[in-house]
């Protein structure tokens, strides 16, 4: 008999494949691999508590690679500071990082939100040619909106 969790993941896998969401399909593939090799009992608790922070660390490493390779240095930083587009990008980077911070907090305290975020992403990708940017920004936006709603209650 197929468990509810396996069926749910399988449905999400099909949706991810239809929507061509590589991150979702790879993530589900890894979860299936862990689940069916019985490593899940050991790894799932760790991923549930530390997975988001681990993912943020990997993303941070990827963002810092151009600095580590010398592709971006002080010269490029100085040149960028002369452009108002760079200042807009800087402000956008700060805003997105702050939104993502709220997203991490929301996903940590309210993990069932992830399902709604995944479905929202799949709908946007499948129906509106959107780009799957991951659950942190979506969760951050949700956190910001929820915080605003709480202020008026």
Curated annotation (Swiss-Prot):
This is UPF0756 membrane protein BCB4264_A4705. Keywords: Cell membrane, Membrane, Transmembrane, Transmembrane helix. InterPro entries: UPF0756_TM. The chain crosses the membrane at residues 8-28, 54-74, 87-107, 117-137. Belongs to the UPF0756 family. GO terms for cellular component: plasma membrane. It is a multi-pass membrane protein. It is found in: Cell membrane. Its main location: membrane. It holds the Pfam family DUF441.
